[in-house]
């Protein structure tokens, strides 16, 4: 190998330095590294007489020559060469460093501009990366190497140069400083290179950048500084706890006065660098102490600050595996037990302030409690189940909400917390819940009564979620009839003459239906047909509210989720789709026929019925996988087109959902599926009408709608073939189904280029370009 190694280098050099094909360059680099490894085998001492040294000599010489102008094109390939041969073994790394680093220092001192200096630092960073590969990081175990790291003799010079650039360069030279930061970070994590005090100096630099410097441009330097602190925390957590935490926590205010900018950046940084266990424990102690002080103040200021503290703790806990955390019981006692008691005190009016009466704070605290309850032992969960309404207090301290006559709004807001606690419990805890013996019929009835009468949105939503959670997760199969009877009783509460229901009652009906449909209860078909009947109500408010509520049934929810152990059957989406869609389609067809029949025999259908059914359709389709939709596309596409015909302000949400559905269909299946249904012209015409700022009298096309319609037009031109086929495969061969409407589209889009909204103009440019490039004119006949 040593005999021919230099000859091989001469051959491979051209492929790397003058790369025509990227894969050839990559293979050539792999060959160079393989030869370096082979020649390094059995070598324990560095010598210039080694075959390895003779092999590396022309390589390093060539690279040094190319690096004379490090900002030029061929310097990058030279860096790649140095990277692959230096990372092959400790001996090769030593030979490369001794040959390459001193000239780089000389070039750096003589450099006449920042561009050249930055390129030289990039080269050093490449060598630092190789050093990490060869010698490992602080966290690398085993693999002790007998050869000393050759970079050690340059340690002081590295520290001086990189520190000077990081903290001494002009603030506007962001990329230069980022390069220095990355190099400093690599050296700080390189095993046994810097002493702790030297890494600590780097940590101080990073803290100063984050705490004292103003943001520049896209904040790239600050983002890199945060990432660097997070990386150092894995290797040297004590430095972060001793240096960064005191500096950052000292900037947090004692109370929320003034702008959120005073504390949000600090909390965001602390959250991102505190995932490691030891550091998180420190973060928890510091922030929980801040929160406790705020809760004891009579005038703590805005609730945004304590909420931000809770959000920070929640974010970090979500990044960690809390089930394996050794301190989980401590967090449980402090947050779930301790803060829930504080919530009860606030609801009873005995707290010093109203922080824990705020629904947004309670929601964040609830999410935190939910995460912890899911992570604790069965015994702890049983404790939560027993205290889910009392919030770990006695009856003298706090009166739980269920069955309480006329509770205050503050008391009712505790339902937000109790709902999150319930969601975190396993199903096995169902028999330990209060008010469930012999069954939960009375509890469910109480919740329904509160749901239909509550007026505060946060409280109303908490009642709805808790009702659905109890029915879906904790109600046994044998007791399902309880929920089904309650569902029917709610429907029967309609006014016999006007057939109207209050919006709160309708939402209660749909959340109860959601609980039953997700678990595919025996009466699922009856439930769904009953919901559809509400859309046909002669009362417009009842019809419209019911139609908008169809998105609730399969919509994502943080409480009723798989994570929380809710019963969500795999076939629930298919069951809903196959039951409801044919009925909606049939009903719209009936309305269309009635609208065109002038016979006096046919009773006129109220104007709101058809838009309401289309609204329900869009709500359902927004939660249904495309694979279920495609077999029914010939039936659904005309309905989607009719949805785009709606032109009132109230239809914007429906049309937005319709455009989202169409975008997915086109992207996943190509324009051919639209063509097979025979609706290319109809679809394009409606999309163009939706892109118009002045589509006609009474028309409302919001900027979002206009941009979404343009996105669909763009997708039509880009995805003319189904996935898996070549771009030239079309039906009929060679002619695009979009060709007949190409001129119409280009003319219309030309007008949209003057839209007052920038996002719309950009979407129009993209769509017009796609049609010009992608929709070919018909081929001329050969003579």
Regions found by a protein language model. Name each.
Residues 594-596:
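Fungal intrinsically disordered, low-complexity polar regions
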């Amino acid at each position: 190998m040593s005999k021919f190694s230099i000859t091989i280098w001469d051959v491979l050099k051209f492929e790397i330095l003058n790369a025509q094909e990227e894969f050839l360059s990559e293979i050539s680099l792999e060959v160079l590294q393989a030869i370096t490894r082979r020649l390094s085998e059995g070598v324990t001492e560095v010598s210039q007489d080694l075959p390895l040294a003779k092999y590396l000599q022309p390589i390093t010489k060539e690279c040094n020559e190319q690096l004379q102008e490090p900002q030029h094109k061929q310097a990058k390939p030279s860096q790649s060469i140095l990277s692959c041969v230096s990372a092959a073994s400790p001996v090769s790394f030593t030979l490369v460093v001794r040959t390459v680093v001193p000239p780089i220092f000389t070039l750096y001192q003589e450099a006449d501009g920042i561009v050249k200096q930055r390129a030289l630092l990039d080269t050093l960073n490449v060598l630092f990366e190789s050093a990490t590969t060869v010698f490992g990081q602080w966290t690398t175990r085993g693999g002790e190497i007998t050869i000393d790291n050759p970079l050690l003799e340059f340690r002081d010079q590295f520290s001086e140069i990189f520190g000077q650039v990081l903290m001494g360069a002009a603030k506007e030279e962001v990329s230069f400083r980022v390069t220095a930061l990355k190099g400093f970070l690599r050296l700080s994590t390189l095993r046994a290179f810097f002493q702790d005090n030297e890494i600590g100096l780097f940590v101080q630099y990073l803290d100063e950048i984050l705490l004292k410097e103003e943001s520049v441009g896209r904040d790239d330097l600050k983002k890199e500084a945060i990432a660097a602190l997070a990386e150092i925390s894995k290797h040297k957590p004590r430095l972060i706890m001793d240096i960064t935490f005191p500096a950052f926590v000292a900037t947090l205010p004692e109370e929320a006065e003034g702008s959120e900018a005073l504390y949000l950046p600090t909390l965001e940084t602390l959250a991102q660098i505190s995932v490691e266990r030891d550091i998180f424990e420190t973060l928890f102690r510091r922030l929980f102490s801040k929160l406790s002080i705020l809760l004891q103040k009579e005038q703590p200021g805005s609730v945004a600050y304590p909420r931000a503290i809770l959000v920070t703790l929640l974010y970090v806990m979500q990044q960690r595996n809390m089930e394996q955390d050794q301190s989980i019981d401590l967090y449980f006692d402090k947050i779930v037990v301790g803060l829930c008691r504080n919530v009860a005190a606030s609801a009873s009016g005995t707290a010093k302030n109203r922080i824990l009466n705020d629904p947004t704070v309670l929601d964040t605290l609830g999410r935190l409690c939910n995460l912890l309850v899911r992570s604790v032992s069965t015994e702890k969960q049983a404790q939560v189940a027993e205290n889910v309404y009392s919030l770990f207090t006695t009856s003298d301290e706090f009166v739980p909400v269920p069955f309480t006559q006329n509770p205050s709004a503050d008391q009712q807001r505790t339902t937000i917390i109790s709902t999150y606690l319930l969601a975190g419990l396993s199903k096995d805890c169902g028999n330990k819940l209060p008010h469930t013996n012999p069954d939960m019929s009375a509890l469910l009835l109480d919740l329904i009564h509160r749901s239909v009468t509550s007026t505060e949105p946060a409280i109303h939503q908490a009642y709805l979620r808790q009702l659905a959670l109890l029915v879906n997760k904790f109600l046994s199969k044998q007791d399902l009839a309880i929920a089904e009877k309650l569902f029917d009783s709610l429907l029967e509460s309609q006014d016999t003459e006007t057939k109207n229901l209050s919006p709160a009652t309708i939402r209660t009906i749909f959340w109860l239906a959601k609980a039953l449909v997700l678990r595919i209860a025996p009466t699922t078909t009856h439930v769904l047909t009953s919901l559809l009947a509400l859309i046909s109500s002669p009362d417009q408010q009842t019809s419209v509210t019911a139609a908008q509520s169809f998105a609730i049934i399969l919509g994502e929810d943080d409480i009723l989720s798989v994570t929380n152990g809710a019963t969500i059957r795999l076939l629930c989406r298919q069951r809903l789709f196959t039951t409801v869609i044919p009925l909606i389609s049939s009903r719209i067809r009936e309305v269309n026929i009635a609208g065109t029949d002038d016979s006096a025999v046919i009773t006129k259908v109220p104007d709101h019925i058809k838009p309401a059914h289309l609204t329900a359709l869009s709500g359902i389709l927004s939660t249904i996988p495309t694979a279920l939709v495609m077999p029914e596309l010939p039936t659904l596409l005309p309905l989607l087109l009719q949805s785009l015909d709606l032109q009132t302000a109230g239809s914007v949400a429906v049309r937005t959902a319709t455009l989202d559905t169409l975008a997915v269909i086109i992207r996943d299946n190509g324009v051919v599926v639209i063509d097979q249904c025979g609706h290319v012209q109809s679809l394009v015409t409606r999309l163009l009408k939706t892109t118009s700022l002045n589509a006609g009298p009474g028309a409302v096309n919001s900027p979002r709608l206009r941009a979404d319609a343009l996105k669909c037009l763009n997708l039509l031109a880009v995805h003319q073939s189904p996935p898996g086929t070549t771009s030239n495969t079309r039906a009929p061969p060679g002619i695009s189904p979009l060709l007949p409407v190409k001129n119409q589209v280009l003319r219309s889009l030309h007008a949209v280029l003057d839209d007052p909204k920038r996002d719309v103009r950009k979407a129009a440019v993209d769509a017009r370009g796609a049609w010009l490039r992608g929709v070919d004119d018909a081929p001329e006949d050969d003579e």
